[in-house]
Swiss-Prot record, chain A:
This is Molybdopterin synthase sulfur carrier subunit. Heterotetramer; composed of 2 small (Mocs2A) and 2 large (Mocs2B) subunits. It is found in: Cytoplasm. Pathway: Cofactor biosynthesis; molybdopterin biosynthesis. Belongs to the MoaD family. MOCS2A subfamily. C-terminal thiocarboxylation occurs in 2 steps, it is first acyl-adenylated (-COAMP) via the hesA/moeB/thiF part of MOCS3, then thiocarboxylated (-COSH) via the rhodanese domain of MOCS3. Keywords: Cytoplasm, Molybdenum cofactor biosynthesis, Nucleotide-binding, Phosphoprotein. It comes from Drosophila yakuba (Fruit fly). The modification 1-thioglycine is found at G90.
Curated annotation (Swiss-Prot), chain B:
This is Adenylyltransferase and sulfurtransferase MOCS3. ATP binds at G101, D122, S129, N130, F131, H132, R133, K146, D190, N191. Keywords: ATP-binding, Cytoplasm, Metal-binding, Molybdenum cofactor biosynthesis, Multifunctional enzyme, Nucleotide-binding, Nucleotidyltransferase, Phosphoprotein, Transferase, tRNA processing, Zinc. In the N-terminal section; belongs to the HesA/MoeB/ThiF family. UBA4 subfamily. The gene is Uba4. Its EC number is 2.7.7.80, 2.8.1.11. The active site is at C248 (glycyl thioester intermediate), C410 (cysteine persulfide intermediate). Binds 1 zinc ion per subunit. One of its GO terms (biological process) is Mo-molybdopterin cofactor biosynthetic process. Residues 355-451 form the Rhodanese domain. One of its GO terms (cellular component) is cytosol. GO terms for molecular function: ATP binding; metal ion binding; molybdopterin-synthase adenylyltransferase activity; molybdopterin-synthase sulfurtransferase activity; thiosulfate-cyanide sulfurtransferase activity; URM1 activating enzyme activity. Zn(2+) binds at C231, C234, C306, C309. InterPro entries: MOCS3/Uba4, Rhodanese-like_dom, Rhodanese-like_dom_sf, ThiF/MoeB/HesA, ThiF_NAD_FAD-bd, Ubiquitin-activating_enz.
Length: 90, 453
């Protein structure tokens, strides 16, 4: 990960199980302006304790699903990330 | 009689009456099923005789009756819906899988709106803990099959709706046969294996799947397998580990939250049938009931290498979904067996031998549950505080005494076993045990007036 480049502050929203694991509904993180999706996932999983659901979540950047983990994500100040695990109750 | 004896006699009688009523409903259900199977055998024979083994042709409605016009007038005058929309609905069939918190409101709105034929699948029976969210069931139908109970309520709402009950668990061997007969499927289930089963089956049969789910204050909704939209596996190729899945019985849920999602499932089904508006496919609606916020997340289109819905599928017939997910296709809890019998204590033994002696009784349920009911000497230390050792500070002095027995307790005797393992590692010289069956066992074996939730 490019640790020396410019960083921006990004909002992170947690839903369902991820909210319990992160112990908060929302947070903010400093992220590099450019990062691969897999590095981003790794970073969020370790920072917020999401290991149990790391393979079962939707990661959305500005309300769009990140479907390819090799994709490079570009962030700007104030962007929003959402972590959405499946819900199965009914 | 003393006041407490009167209380306990009252609650015993009430419970017995409720059990008898439930037993009566179950017997009536058996009779209905027997009668239904006899009559369906007879009609199958007639069909063979008449050489009409194909599914019986249904008459297509081309006109609304005067009753239809009066009944549906408020939606008929919607320009995008109109007579053609009503006729499409009248000629449509929808299968609702699960008649719980989502299925009840969904079925209610579909029947009320004039959906011609509804199929209802649920293996479960009505019980009191359902009523706060499963709004078709009622006190007098405790013990009855949920599908049957829903049918009775729906026919009262709209006698023109044709309703078929499937009072059994949906699984790989019966799913295709049942689903084939319907135009649209609603996933109102409460467990992960059924969600994969329904998604795969709907891909194979090319049926749109309106999928809703809810837990605590959260809800999710999307339509799978519609247009170029994805299936459940495109989004979640790997099932979650069982320990990351919470059911409504453990996590809780508000009826107004399941009601919101269930009503929206009915809405999406109507849009699919009528061809109205923009169907919620390729988008996931996230409802956060605590903040009142709805979000739409653009989800992917079909995954090009999806094992089921891609052009070259690896899975072409239904599999064993309980094995695939490592979970049961119900939301019922299975008792854990983490401890050997000498590490545990029955509630009767505790009551008879230990309760009057000095001991430390720790109730490891979450605080919200402890507030519902608790044993007199119990102190509340939620399981998380046991596991992160924050309880040590609170009991510093008491825990120095190796002679003081420690008893751990929870609702059903699962979490208490996890707690025993943890506390015992830290205090190997102490007597650390849990109560088998937890508070449920306490009510059943010691004090029938103690509440059950």
């Amino acid at each position: 990960m490019n640790a020396d480049g410019p960083v921006v502050n990004v909002h992170v929203l947690f839903f369902a199980k991820s909210r319990e694991l992160a112990n908060t509904p929302r947070s903010k993180v400093d992220l590099p302006t450019e990062i691969t999706a897999s590095d981003l996932l790794e970073l969020l999983v370790s920072k917020f304790g999401l290991t149990p659901i790391r393979d079962n979540l939707i990661l959305a950047h500005n309300e769009s699903y990140i479907d390819n983990l090799s994709e490079r994500i570009l962030f700007k100040e104030g962007d929003e990330l959402a972590i959405i695990p499946p819900l199965s109750g009914g | 009689m003393m006041e407490s004896e009167v209380d306990s006699e009252q609650s015993r009688l009430k419970r017995e009456i409720a059990e008898l009523r439930a037993a009566l409903n179950r017997k009536e259900q058996c009779l209905r099923e027997l009668e239904a199977s006899v009559s369906s055998d007879a009609s199958a024979e007639e069909q063979v005789v008449g050489n009409a083994l194909e599914s019986p042709g249904r008459a297509v409605h081309t006109k609304l009756t005067n009753d239809d016009i009066a009944r549906y007038s408020r939606q008929l005058i919607l320009p995008d819906f109109g007579v053609q929309g009503q006729l499409k609905l009248k000629n449509s069939s929808v299968l609702i899988v699960g008649l719980g918190g989502l299925g009840c409101p969904a079925a209610q709105y579909l029947a009320a709106a004039g959906c011609g034929r509804l199929g209802l699948i649920d293996y479960d029976e009505v019980e009191r803990s359902n009523f706060h969210r499963q709004i078709l069931h009622s006190e007098s139908r405790c013990g009855m099959s949920k599908a049957e109970s829903a049918r009775i309520a729906l026919l009262e709402l709209n006698p023109h709706c044709e309703i078929h009950c499937h009072s059994r668990l949906l699984y790989s061997q019966n799913a295709l046969h049942i689903i084939r007969g319907y135009d649209v499927v609603l996933d109102c289930s409460d467990n992960v294996p059924t969600r994969y089963l329904l998604s795969d089956a709907c891909v194979m049969l090319r049926k749109p799947l309106v999928s809703g789910s809810a837990l605590k204050m959260d809800g999710q909704l999307t339509v799978y397998n519609y247009g170029n939209g994805p299936c459940y596996r495109c989004i979640y190729p790997v099932p979650p580990p069982p320990e990351a899945v919470t059911n409504c019985g453990d996590g809780g849920v508000l009826g107004a939250v399941t009601g919101t999602i269930g009503a929206m499932q009915a809405l999406e089904a109507i849009k699919v049938i009528v061809g109205l508006g923009d169907v919620l496919a390729g988008r996931l609606l996230i409802f956060d009931g605590s903040s009142g916020l709805f979000r739409n997340i653009r989800i992917r289109s079909k995954r090009p290498n999806c094992h089921v819905c891609s052009a070259q599928p690896l899975i072409t017939e239904l599999i064993d979904y309980e094995m695939f997910c490592g979970m049961h296709a119900t939301d019922k809890d299975n008792p854990l067996q983490l401890l050997s019998t000498d590490e545990r204590l029955s509630v009767k033994d505790y009551h008879a031998k230990l309760q009057a002696q000095p001991h430390l009784l720790i109730d490891v349920r979450p605080t919200a549950e402890f507030e519902i009911c608790q044993l007199p000497e119990a102190v509340n230390v939620p399981l998380v505080e046991i596991l992160d050792d924050s309880y040590l500070k609170r009991f510093g002095k008491q825990l120095e005494d190796k002679e003081l027995p420690i008893i751990l307790l929870c609702r059903r005797g699962n979490d208490s076993q996890i707690a025993v393992q943890h506390v015992r590692n830290r205090f190997p010289m102490h007597s650390v045990r849990d109560l088998i069956g937890g508070l449920h066992a306490w009510t059943n074996s010691v004090d029938p007036s103690f509440p059950i939730y």
